[in-house]
Curated annotation (Swiss-Prot):
Enzyme class: transferase
Name of the featured protein: DNA (cytosine-5)-methyltransferase 1
Ranges of residues in domain Chromo: 441-504
InterPro entries from the UniProt entry: BAH_dom, BAH_sf, C5-Methyltransferase, C5_DNA_meth_AS, C5_MeTfrase, Chromo-like_dom_sf, Chromo/chromo_shadow_dom, Chromo_domain
Compositionally skewed regions (Basic and acidic residues) per UniProt: 21-30
Record's subcellular location: Nucleus
One GO cellular component term: nucleus
């Protein structure tokens, strides 16, 4: 029996560029610990922006159609924007989650390093071996010259060094075109079943070689087909979720091959290639005529399901080196593109993901417009609407949005698409003109639509503007209460359909979003590891895919935390991938590190592409900055890290540090009430020059060709105001690299790096009488943590920007000032342009920034999306090398920053 090649589950390529980091660049003694906790906190913080329940409105009485009722607008309480005196329960729980995350990380690395992948080695066919005729080759051998030309590695001497997990190439004496097994003749190109191991379904393959080895054994080579359950999806094939169903006759052609002895062949199987874009009726007939069919290929690299380039399944290499864009000129992209596409941003937050996608797409020549956005956090919606005034921003739950879309389609069919419905308009108008009772009020017009929400029952509600009353008196009325106003409904629906206030199936070109999965967080003590989708806190993943299934966009991009690939054997990540494949989308999955795209922040996230079979599947942009990729991934996703192989030597920019991002910002105090001020100085670095660019220079067309508001001003440069005790503590943290609570008087470090009280020093008190060093700092992570009241330094990077700014258990104090990082400083670490203004209380602004997708990562993905959308991204390579000028655009205006006059005093407030 022949040795087998690496299976799809085994890592056969280096997943990332891994080198030892320099000690002077990053304080490595604590960075990996910080990364785990920060990532955990980022997962936790999603809760604030994308899920949960709003405070209920006061109960209200339903009244007949045109009767006015009390205001039912939703209100949200405003939190006090001052740091709490001590960590709350959620902050303290971070220590427990961090320890659990660290254990999970170690387990993942161990699995990736030591777990051997399953290899497709055929088993001897007992029936064939026991038959009257031994398996044999038939006909004359292939001519020697032809054989050496077709299969050179079988005859030449191996010169390249074999990789540790690479199968040794069997050498051949001669090749044949056919063979006989159990009295059945098999030819090259035949599709066959191959005997698998005990209790395993037989393998399916296409014969590509028959040869006699130098050991005189008879071999055949198969190029494997994979059932859905053979891929990374595996056990998710049979889960019971509405709309999630795989055709058991559908298989996927791969590039994986194995050599096996001839008597492993069981029988022939009829497999046909089905063009995914062929006529549905013809497709159904073709599928009916065969045993199995395939319409896509499967590759372990980036868990890729993609169109097959030709009927015979020939596809390109999965290496990065074949795709380059050195010849791409971004200078021509400085004017507004003419080709447009529409975008729906789900779980949008303040809009980081969609903003980045649109910026990157513009560079590729595609004008991607965020036409719709949905989020449950009202402050995030306010921020997005301000920065994208043309976007229809909806402050509601995603499942209510989906229900609304379905009801909207019914209304459009009734009032727009069905011509006969217009015939009743005169009768409707006559009915609406009937005399009023004295307690009735006239509906002037309908100005909004929603589905349920707040304390309302499920169903369609219209926002009513009453004749003679101002907008503050508008109310939400159920559609049944407006039965006397069919003409008003008709007018609203027809106008809304014309303006596309809500998308219908076919209206959306791209859907992006990051559905929150709080059920996998360490803060959830009752996590369902066996069936995560039965946890209500994970249901948004199902809702996201349900919206995709309903609207059928051309492209899908889903973002999430890496834990979806780790928790419960990657259940949620596999589910998302499985849904897209079941819906006949092409798909691929990759993990990207924000620092690799020009930020002083590590922040690893998962990005899942989906593309209709009629479109080009986008690639992942290769890193542009030299950042060490740390951390492991589950074995099933070990080849999904977007990075250069360690054998490659790309020309990358030097990794950015904290000082590169924020050293130009003016000094502010612990309490800074003003959210608009002057810069007070010029930018000092390339990053700072870029981040200060105007909307037009950055190719942000949210305000058309004109300038947006507040351009050239410094926005949201406000820190979370520390309470008096914490402010006094922060003032005593030394201004030096690595400083934290351990530097305070009365603390010393004992054995095993565990802090303890210095018995020779009386416990120091604050002016309030409380201890200088709080107990929670001493006990955090069992006394081993360096985080409480930690000070950042200019030559460091931040593991992950989170949603909280309290210094109790994270390193967030400014390098030289007695305060935490401001909202704007955090926003810069996330890559938000300085013109991007945020709304809401200060704590809410931190939440918006921490929950966002890093803008430069989304921008790089947007460029790849634009390339694919415009048909300019060719080949099956999953990775794309961005143009050299990409890191310093916009185009010809890369160096033009619109800084404030140098003479303006730092921190001076500009009154609005």
């Amino acid at each position: 029996m022949a040795p087998s090649s690496p299976s799809p589950a085994a890592p056969t390529r280096v997943s990332g560029r891994k080198r030892a980091a320099k000690a002077e660049e990053i304080h490595q003694n604590k960075e990996e610990e910080e990364e785990v906790a920060a990532a955990s906190s980022a997962k936790r913080s999603r809760k604030a922006a994308s899920s949960g329940k709003k405070p209920k409105s006061p109960p209200k009485q339903a009244k007949p159609g045109r009767k006015k009722k009390g205001d039912a607008e939703m209100k949200e309480p405003v939190e006090d924007d001052v740091c709490a005196e001590e960590p709350d329960e959620e902050e303290l729980a971070m220590g427990e989650e961090e320890a659990e995350e660290q254990a999970m990380q170690e387990e993942v690395v161990a699995v990736a390093a030591g777990s051997p992948g399953k290899k497709r080695v055929g088993r001897r066919n007992a029936a064939a071996a026991a038959g009257d005729h031994e398996p044999e080759f038939i006909g004359s051998p292939v001519a020697a010259d032809e054989a050496r030309s077709n299969w050179p590695k079988r005859y030449g001497r191996s010169t390249a060094a074999k990789k540790p997990d690479e199968e040794e190439e069997l050498k051949a004496r001669c090749h044949y075109r056919s063979a006989k097994v159990d009295n059945v003749v098999y030819c090259l190109g035949d599709d066959v079943y191959v005997k698998a191991g005990e209790n395993e379904a037989d393998y399916i393959g296409r014969i590509t070689e028959f040869f006699e080895g130098t050991d005189q054994c008879h071999y055949f080579t198969c190029r494997w087909f994979f059932r859905a359950e053979d891929t990374v999806i595996n056990s998710l094939v049979s889960i019971s979720v509405d709309g999630h169903k795989h055709d058991p006759r559908r298989v996927f052609l791969s590039e994986e091959k194995n050599d096996n002895v001839l008597d492993c062949i069981i029988s022939k199987v009829k497999i046909v290639h089905v063009d995914p874009n062929m006529d549905p009726k013809a497709k159904a007939q073709l599928i009916e005529s065969c045993d199995l069919y395939y319409d896509m290929s499967y590759s372990v690299a980036y868990s890729t399901f993609a169109n097959i380039s030709s009927e015979n399944g020939q596809s390109g290499s999965d290496t990065a080196s074949g795709i380059s864009s050195d010849d791409v000129d971004l200078e021509t992209s400085s004017s507004m593109p003419t080709r447009t596409a529409t975008l729906l941003d789900l779980y949008s937050g303040c809009g980081g993901m969609s903003t980045g996608l649109c910026l990157g797409a513009a560079l590729s020549g595609l004008k991607l417009e965020t036409r719709w956005a949905v989020d449950f956090n009202s402050f995030a919606c306010q921020s997005l609407k301000y920065n994208h005034p043309q976007t229809e921003v909806r402050n509601e739950k995603a499942d209510e949005f989906l229900a609304l879309l379905k009801e909207w389609a019914v209304l459009c069919k009734k009032y727009v698409q069905d011509v006969d419905s217009n015939l009743a308009s005169s009768e409707d108008q006559a009915d609406e003109d009937s005399p009023l009772d004295k307690d009735e009020f006239v509906v002037e017009k309908l100005v909004g639509i929603c589905y349920g929400g707040s304390d309302r029952e499920n169903g369609i509600y219209f926002k009513v503007q009453w004749e003679g009353y101002g907008p503050e008196e508008d109310t939400w009325e159920p559609i049944d209460n407006l039965s006397d106003c069919p003409q008003k409904i008709r007018e609203f629906v027809q106008e809304g359909h014309k303006r596309k206030i809500l998308p219908l199936p076919g209206d959306v070109d791209v859907i992006c979003g990051g559905p929150p999965c709080q059920g996998i967080s360490g803060f959830n003590r009752y996590r369902n590891r066996d069936e995560p989708l039965k946890d209500e806190k994970n249901k948004q993943m199902v809702t996201f895919m349900d919206i995709v299934a309903y609207l059928k966009p051309k492209y899908v991009l889903m973002e999430n935390v890496v834990d979806i690939l780790k928790f419960a054997d990657g259940y949620l990540g596999k589910y998302a991938l499985s849904c897209l494949v079941a819906m006949k989308y092409q798909a691929r999955l990759g993990m990207m590190v924000a620092g690799c795209y020009g930020l002083p922040q590590f922040r690893m996230r998962v990005f899942l592409w989906g593309a209709l079979s009629s479109m080009v599947l986008p690639k992942y942009p290769l890193p542009t900055y030299d950042v060490v990729v740390r951390g492991g991934a589950p074995n099933a996703f070990s080849q999904c890290m977007v990075a250069y192989d360690e054998t490659q030597k790309p020309s990358l920019k030097k990794a950015l540090l904290l000082g590169d991002a924020i050293s130009d910002l003016p000094k502010v105090q612990n309490h800074q009430p003003n959210d608009v001020m002057e810069y007070g100085g010029s930018p000092k670095t390339e990053f700072q020059r870029y981040i200060r660019l105007s909307r037009k220079d950055m190719l942000d067309w949210s305000f058309g060709e004109g300038a947006g508001p507040d351009e050239g001003k410094l926005l949201d440069h406000q820190p979370l105001r520390l309470n008096n005790d914490d402010y006094e503590r922060v003032q005593q943290i030394p201004v030096k690299k690595g400083a934290n609570f351990r530097d305070l008087k009365g603390v010393r470090v004992g054995a095993n790096n565990i802090v303890e009280w210095d018995p020779e020093i009386e416990r120091v008190k604050l002016s309030s009488g409380k201890p200088l060093v709080p107990d929670y700092a001493m006990s955090f992570i069992k006394g081993k943590s360096l985080k409480p009241f930690g000070r950042l330094w200019w030559d460091e990077t931040v593991p992950t920007v989170v949603t909280r700014a309290e210094p109790h258990n994270q390193v967030i104090i400014h390098p030289t000032q007695a305060r935490v990082l401001t909202i704007r400083e955090n926003a810069r670490l996330q890559g938000f342009p300085d013109y991007y203004r945020l709304f809401g209380p200060i704590k809410e602004k931190y939440i918006q920034v921490g929950n966002a997708v890093a803008v430069p990562v989304a921008r790089a993905l947007g460029y790849c999306l634009g390339q694919a959308y415009l048909g300019e991204s060719e080949g099956s390579d999953p990775l794309y090398q961005l143009p050299p000028s990409f890191t310093s655009v916009g185009g010809r205006t890369a160096g033009q920053a619109r800084a404030s006059p140098v003479g303006t005093p730092a921190g001076e407030v500009v009154e609005q």
